Swiss-Prot record:
[4Fe-4S] cluster binds at residues 114, 117, 205. Its cofactor is Mg(2+); [4Fe-4S] cluster. This is tRNA-cytidine(32) 2-sulfurtransferase. The gene is ttcA. One of its GO terms (biological process) is tRNA thio-modification. It comes from Ralstonia nicotianae (strain ATCC BAA-1114 / GMI1000). A motif (PP-loop motif) lies at residues 39-44. Binds 1 [4Fe-4S] cluster per subunit. The cluster is chelated by three Cys residues, the fourth Fe has a free coordination site that may bind a sulfur atom transferred from the persulfide of IscS. It is found in: Cytoplasm.
Length: 312
């Protein structure tokens, strides 16, 4: 397979972004065993490819085990992933669990099955990780997924909550990591096309994409068309939170604010971002030649001395 210079730049960029995310959040450490979850989609294929490349030159030792869950969906091509994983030479496990029948039994026809399917799949993944001795579980969610989830939670859940690059499972047994957290979906898609990954469609179950998620995704794509770079800016905002400029009393001690010694800087008080109002500059505050600044107070309704009184 011959690749262009553009492809090599793309590959380098994805590896660099994943490496930076791994470093920023300490996703992978020396001695880790990482269970790499493969669905057969573009994101998980790209994640495995990037992790294998980083593993070869990493200054630490860690183990990768690829995992695919065969959920017994009708038409699922059972030989595709084993064939690919043997070809690339990575240790792997195929887990068979008929979650498909459970989902079809529990969810009414025509309804979205993704939520229940995800919960069942998560349980199988956690159990498999424990059996294999894997302390890290790698998922293929990317930057766009994180931003999309942020708006879903804000619009429909009333929370400023996204999808964290790293988190502990509820029982504390494993750490879930998302190495593609800094990677854009369009670049992952371009990489997957160039690599000619054997993609397995995600709609074999017959479920429709969640309507709310679809609408938010369309909204973000339209924003990106109108103002390229907007998704990048939104993701950057998730990394630059200013609790004093929100309204969550659990994040910032508003009740503890007092006069006297400032608890936040003047820049934070008056703002320095592009869409804040211009900072208020007090007369004389930046000029040592002015020793005293006087102001006059005019009691309500009283005209200054010597001024003409208004006509009755």
């Amino acid at each position: 397979m011959t690749f262009s210079n553009n492809f090599h730049r793309l590959e380098t960029r994805l590896q660099s972004q994943a490496g930076r995310a791994i470093g920023d959040f300490k996703m992978i450490e020396d001695g880790d065993t990482v269970l790499v979850c493969l669905s057969g989609g573009k994101d998980s294929y790209t994640m495995l490819s990037v992790l294998m490349a980083l593993q070869k030159r990493a200054p630490i030792d860690f183990k990768l085990i690829a995992m695919n869950l065969d959920q017994k969906q009708p038409g699922f091509p059972e030989d595709v992933l084993p064939g690919y994983l043997k070809k690339v030479g990575v240790e792997y496990v195929i887990v068979e669990a008929d979650t498909y029948s459970i989902v079809k039994e529990k969810v009414p026809e025509g309804k979205t099955t993704c939520s229940l399917c995800s919960r069942l799949r998560r349980g199988v993944i956690y159990r498999t990780a424990k059996e294999l001795g894997a302390n890290k579980i790698a998922l293929g969610h990317h930057r766009d997924d994180i931003v999309n989830t942020f708006f879903l939670n804000m619009f429909f859940g009333g929370k400023m909550k996204a999808m964290p690059p790293k988190l502990a499972t509820d029982n504390g047994d494993h750490i879930v990591i998302r190495p593609l957290a800094y990677c854009a979906e369009k670049e992952i898609a371009a990489y997957a096309r160039a690599m000619e990954f054997p993609i397995i469609p995600c709609n074999l179950c017959g479920s429709q994409e969640n309507l709310q998620r679809k609408k938010v995704k369309e909204m973000l794509l339209e924003w990106e068309r109108q103002a390229p770079g907007r998704i990048d800016n939104i993701f950057s905002a998730l990394q630059n939170v200013v609790p004093s400029h929100l309204a969550d009393t659990d994040l910032f001690d508003f009740n503890g604010l007092t006069t006297g010694l400032a608890k936040i800087g003047e820049e934070a008080l008056f703002g320095q971002t592009a869409y804040d109002q211009a900072p208020l500059v007090f007369a004389g505050s930046h000029d040592d030649r002015i020793e005293f600044v006087r102001f006059e107070r005019n009691p309500a309704g009283k005209a200054p001395e010597g001024a003409e009184q208004p006509a009755a």
